[in-house]
Amino acid sequence: MNEPRGSEVWIGGLLCEPVNPQACAGVVFFNNVGVLNMCGHGTIGLAVTLAHLGRIQPGEHILETPVGDVRIRLHDANRVTVINVPSYRYRAAVPVDVPGYGQFVGDIAWGGNWFYLVEDHDEQLELANSERLTEVSWAIRMALEEQGITG
């Protein structure tokens, strides 16, 4: 999970016995930053892993996460549908002043974790610009924390 080969995008899942007797498993997701309440791609990978281990068969299942039950449908060994916990916009048009970049306006949303979603910016969304996008994203994240803007 940690450098030199790991990064924040690597996700681990700690399998636990579920409290809900209808759940096939409990899971706590984490990365090199800390615990994640929910992870969509981690859920897909976990469903495929549970099938590989023989713990689930194709069909609908419940996966217990710290934020609630997530429904998964295993179609076959490599295809999964995830029905996440309910998502919502908590606050709209929230400004944040980011040193060196100016002001951004975004929505705070919940989808298993908290997100700050920015639509209007001057950055090019392309792979060649990934380093700059990462810098700007981290600057926004730090400014949100410093200014106490949270979900």
Language model regions located:
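Glycine-rich ThDP/TPP pyrophosphate-binding loop and its adjacent helix/strand module
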Residues: 112
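A glycine-rich beta-to-alpha transition motif near the start of alpha/beta enzyme domains, typified by
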Residues: 1-107, 119-151
